[in-house]
Each structure stands twice: as C-alpha cells, then as structure tokens.
Swiss-Prot record:
Induction: Expressed at 72 hpi, barely detectable at 48 hpi. The record marks 127, 135 as: Important for the disruption of the host mitochondrial membrane potential and the induction of apoptosis. Undergoes active degradation during infection. Keywords: Host-virus interaction, Modulation of host cell apoptosis by virus. The keyword DNA-binding does not apply. It comes from Crimean-Congo hemorrhagic fever virus (strain Nigeria/IbAr10200/1970). It comes from the Viruses. Disrupts the host mitochondrial membrane potential and induces apoptosis probably by inducing host CASP8 and CASP9. GO terms for biological process: symbiont-mediated perturbation of host apoptosis. This is Non-structural protein. Residues 93-140 are annotated as: Apoptotic activity.
C-alpha cells in the first residue's frame, strides 16, 4: 500500500518531508498560531511552524501538509483537499476537509469534515472523525476500517 496522508490545496506532493501521526497541524492560518487546541491534539510551538518545509501556507490561508499514519506492517493512503473560500472574510469561517478514503478492501468513501479555523488537530483525530462519517454513508466493517486507518 502507498504511504501517505496528503493535505493540499493543489496537486503538490510533499512526500520529502513526512510528518508523524502525533504531529498537530493548524486548520487555517487566518488566526495566529498556536491557537485553541483540540482535546486530543498536542499544541505546537509557534516558532517551530514557519521554518518547517513540510508545512506550506496556501494563498487563501489554508494549510498544506503531508502526514504519515502508521499501520501494523504498512501505511495506508488517504488524500484530502482543502475546500476554502477567497480572502477577505468578515468573520472566521468554517473550513471543510474532503477525505478520499482508500480502505484496505479497495473500496472508496468520500467524506467531508467541517472544522473551525485556528484549531489544532492531530492526524488521528481527523481520521477518526472521517471514519465515523464514512461509516454512516457506506456499509463496512468498523473493525476493518479501524485496522486500515488506526
């Protein structure tokens, strides 16, 4: 299986700079970081983010990143894209992440997740939220999905 969870606003691939599953990323750059931390996420030092080549800011404030999620003996690929609006928001909007989840059985489920800008999320938190939504849309074994994405 391929080995990446890609978050991007374009087809840019950042596989040279993998992040760990425990790495927390910012959902939007509209709010200075660090900001509110999700209960399952670990805050990241402000000075550590701008210099990192694996974290690139999109022109409209989204964040592009590559994360690796460990499986038992391999890694599982999921592709995400930021769905953001133009610049000049009068108030911080909600951002949506679209997950294209390639399950181990080769079935595909498309899942949208709405998140608040300025909030820190871990890769595991986002993937678990995607799993819950995907399971409500497409019948599959939860244990099978969990084995593929945990």
């Amino acid at each position: 299986m391929l080995s990446a969870l890609a978050l991007s606003t374009s087809s840019l691939c950042l596989s040279r700079y993998p992040l760990r599953a425990s790495t927390v990323f910012l959902a939007s750059s509209n709010i200075p970081f660090p900001s509110v931390s999700a209960s399952l996420a670990r805050p990241v030092a402000t000075s550590a983010i701008p210099e990192r080549p694996d974290l690139l800011m999109s022109p409209h404030g989204g964040l592009k990143a590559m994360m690796y999620l460990p499986l038992t003996n391999s890694l599982h690929q999921s592709t995400c894209s930021w769905l953001t609006g133009p610049r000049g928001f009068s108030s911080p909007p909600l951002f949506r992440i679209r997950f294209l989840l390639l399950i181990m059985s080769d079935s595909i489920s498309l899942t949208d997740i709405t998140i608040s800008p300025g909030t820190l999320y871990s890769a595991r938190t986002l993937l678990l939220r995607a799993a819950v939504l995907a399971l409500t849309r497409k019948p599959m074994s939860f244990l099978h999905f969990k084995a593929a994405c945990w």
